[in-house]
């Protein structure tokens, strides 16, 4: 249903819906929204198809995550309406060399919803040589 709706209405409706669901603390500017809409123009059908296939795709990838031998910092918004925080915990459990940060009172776009905390997380992660703990 939604794939048909967004195919008919196009990227603006798709992005508007995502913004309503994805942010708790941040309101993107008109310029940011326009840029985001432009990036999805003509691609809404394939993008919604990708989202529909996401759970199946994870089944193919998940078994290989344990072999990933690089530090990974998983970050997530606690109130993510698209991908629940339980997904972050599962991903963290599958990655042998990972850290997990779940931002409280935060939606899907945590890099904007909690920009100060996110910036500090990245700064610390990079400055500490991607070390865990």
Functional labels for PLM-detected ranges:
Residues 97-133:
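Catalytic active-site module of serine/aspartate enzymes centered on a nucleophile-bearing elbow/loop
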Residues 32, 61, 70, 84-93:
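Short alpha-helix in the alpha/beta-hydrolase fold that links the catalytic acid
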Residues 55, 79-83:
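Acidic catalytic loop of the alpha/beta-hydrolase fold
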Residues 8-67:
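Conserved alpha/beta-hydrolase catalytic His-Asp/Glu region
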Residues 51, 75-76, 102-103:
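Short beta-strand segments
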Residues 42, 69-70, 96-97:
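Active-site acidic short loop of glycosyltransferases
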Residues 68, 74-76, 80:
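Short beta-strand/loop motif that positions the catalytic acidic residue
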Residues 1-8:
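Flexible "cap/lid" loop of the alpha/beta hydrolase fold
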């Amino acid at each position: 249903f939604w794939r048909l709706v967004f195919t008919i209405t196009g990227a603006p409706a798709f992005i508007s819906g995502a913004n309503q669901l994805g942010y708790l603390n941040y309101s993107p500017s008109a310029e940011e929204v326009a840029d985001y809409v432009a990036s999805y123009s003509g691609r809404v059908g394939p993008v919604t198809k990708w989202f529909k296939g996401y759970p199946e795709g994870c089944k193919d990838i998940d078994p290989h995550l344990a072999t990933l031998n690089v530090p990974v910092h998983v970050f997530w918004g606690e109130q993510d309406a698209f991908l629940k925080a339980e997904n972050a915990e599962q991903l963290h459990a599958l990655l042998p060399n990972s850290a997990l940060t779940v931002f409280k009172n935060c939606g899907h776009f945590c890099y904007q919803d909690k920009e100060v905390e996110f910036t500090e997380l990245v700064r610390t992660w990079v400055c500490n040589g991607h070390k865990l703990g």
